[in-house]
């Protein structure tokens, strides 16, 4: 966002006479919809959305909507009776937030600018008027929304609309959480000011005592990994499902980044007892994947953030890798740090009885899935913590698969494993 745009945001947020008249004129379009039939009421709502767009987004110096106007748009998104209304309100809200952010990094890069009393779809307190009470999103509602997105539905038009509405709503809420969390985390990394993240929408949602975080994460994984039959669903639903998956993956990364930042703050001693304690998302994910091989395979197919995918696999495998012997003057055992890198873990498959013991504990298919996905993820980015070259890692992955066959000739290399071996071989050939 440009400096000029930021400046315009600050000045335009001051309520002016024009802003007051804009609110009165636009809201008048939908205040009387209760007395009209549904078709006329829907037309009035569409006209209201267009009026807000014309006043706030079309002009170069458009004025931001008032909180009541935002509230009315959000109400249309949540309770809209047609796909056109839901789509139009979703697009308008996301564009308005891009144009008029409530939190952003200042020009100094270590300062966060926050707009006071900016509207939010979330509510974290009890001081809320009756109009917002049934509209604003609380922590428990988010958990229920995730559960509802994973429910089987009938093939009726009404059911499809309900599912579409839930997906649009989740996409929007994830978008708001990202716009709020990203600048806060960026400045936190520069300043180690924990209060910036403590007050983020994401932290406030997850810190609520009303939320069972473990159950939330289980529902989250189940929803994210659920399949949708393209032959039985409309094209619009299938496409929106893809968009929803993208939003879910981004939100999951944010949750793990929040946990990482919280851990740093804990180590620095800048948190307090009031910040609460909850199990990190990574631990819950690992527990769920450990006891469900199908979920593990599906999750690694769906979740495509290479950095976090690699981290999840490494932590999974570390539980089954023999602990390194403490180094002495006479030993040549690799240092413990080696077991924290992909190449270090792959090398353990070439040492003695390690392949047999690891395969016995988690199964040959799971081993192939884990090391294969970790390898493909590692190929896509540079890891400053791992000094080994890509060529070394390619050689190690080939050696690991060879060791699996050496353990038991009956072990079948999965088609996915063959793809991994082919990729490793091609990389080595290209670098030769």
Curated annotation (Swiss-Prot):
Q: Where's it found, cell-wise?
A: Nucleus
**Keywords assigned by UniProt?**
DNA damage, DNA recombination, DNA repair, DNA-binding, Hypersensitive response, Nucleus, Plant defense, Repressor, Transcription, Transcription regulation
Return the InterPro entries for the record.
SNI1 (IPR034561)
Write out the GO cellular component annotations: nucleus; Smc5-Smc6 complex
A Gene Ontology biological process in which this protein takes part is: chromatin remodeling
Tissues in which the UniProt entry reports expression: Expressed at low levels in the veins.
What is the documented disruption phenotype for this protein?
Answer: Accumulation of DNA damage leading to constitutively activated DNA damage responses (DDR). Increased basal expression of pathogenesis-related (PR) genes (e.g. PR1) and hypersensitive response (HR). Chromatin modifications at the PR-1 promoter that mimic induction (e.g. AcH3 and MeH3K4). Dwarf plants with distorted leaves, reduced root length, early flowering and reduced fertility. Decreased susceptibility to the beet cyst nematode H.schachtii. Mutant plants display enhanced resistance to the bacterial pathogen P.syringae pv. tomato DC3000.
Q: What is its main location?
A: nucleus
Q: What Gene Ontology molecular-function terms does this entry list?
A: transcription cis-regulatory region binding
Please describe what this protein does.
Component of the SMC5-SMC6 complex, a complex involved in repair of DNA double-strand breaks by homologous recombination. Transcription repressor that prevents expression of pathogenesis-related genes (PR) via histone modifications and binding negative cis-acting elements at their promoters. Negative regulator of hypersensitive response (HR) and systemic acquired resistance (SAR) required to dampen the basal expression of pathogenesis related (PR) genes.
Assembly and oligomerization = Interacts with SSN2. Binds to NTL9/CBNAC to promote its binding to promoters of target genes. Component of the SMC5-SMC6 complex which consists at least of SMC5 and SMC6B. Interacts with RAD17.
The protein's name in its UniProt record = Negative regulator of systemic acquired resistance SNI1
Q: Which organism is it from?
A: Arabidopsis thaliana (Mouse-ear cress)
Gene field: SNI1
């Amino acid at each position: 966002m440009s400096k000029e745009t930021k400046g315009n945001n600050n000045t335009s947020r001051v309520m002016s006479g024009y802003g007051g008249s804009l609110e009165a004129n636009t809201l008048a379009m939908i205040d009387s919809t209760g007395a009209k039939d549904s078709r006329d009421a829907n037309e009035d709502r569409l006209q209201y959305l267009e009026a807000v767009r014309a006043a706030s987004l079309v002009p170069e110096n458009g004025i931001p909507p008032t909180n009541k106007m935002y509230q009315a748009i959000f109400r249309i998104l949540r309770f809209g009776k047609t796909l056109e209304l839901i789509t139009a309100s979703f697009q308008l809200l996301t564009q308005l937030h891009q144009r008029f952010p409530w939190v952003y990094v200042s020009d100094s890069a270590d300062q966060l600018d926050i707009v006071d009393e900016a509207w939010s779809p979330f509510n974290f307190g009890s001081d809320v008027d009756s109009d917002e009470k049934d509209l604003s999103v609380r922590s428990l509602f988010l958990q229920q929304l995730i559960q509802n997105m994973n429910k089987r539905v009938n093939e009726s038009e009404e059911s499809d609309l309900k599912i579409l509405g839930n997906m649009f709503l989740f996409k929007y809420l994830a978008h708001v959480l990202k716009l709020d969390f990203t600048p806060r985390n960026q400045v936190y990394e520069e300043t180690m000011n924990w209060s910036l993240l403590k007050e983020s929408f994401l932290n406030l949602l997850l810190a609520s005592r009303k939320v069972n975080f473990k159950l939330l994460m289980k529902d989250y994984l189940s929803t994210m990994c659920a399949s949708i039959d393209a032959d039985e669903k409309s094209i619009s639903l299938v496409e929106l499902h893809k968009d929803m998956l993208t939003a879910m993956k981004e939100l999951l990364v944010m949750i793990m980044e929040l946990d990482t930042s919280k851990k740093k703050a804990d180590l620095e001693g800048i948190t307090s007892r009031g910040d609460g304690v909850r199990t990190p998302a990574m631990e819950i994910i690992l527990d769920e994947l450990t006891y469900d091989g199908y979920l593990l395979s599906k999750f690694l197919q769906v979740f495509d953030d290479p950095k976090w995918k690699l981290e999840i696999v490494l932590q999974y495998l570390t539980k089954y890798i023999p602990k390194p012997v403490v180094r002495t003057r006479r030993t040549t055992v690799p240092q413990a740090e080696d077991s924290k890198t992909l190449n270090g873990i792959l090398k353990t498959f070439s040492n003695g009885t390690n392949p047999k013991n690891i395969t016995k504990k988690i199964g040959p298919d799971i081993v192939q899935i884990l090391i294969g996905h970790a390898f493909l993820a590692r190929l896509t980015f540079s890891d400053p913590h791992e000094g080994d070259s890509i060529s070394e890692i390619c050689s190690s992955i080939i050696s690991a698969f060879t060791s699996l066959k050496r353990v038991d000739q009956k072990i079948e290399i999965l088609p996915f494993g063959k793809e991994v071996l082919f990729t490793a071989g091609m990389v080595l050939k290209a670098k030769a």
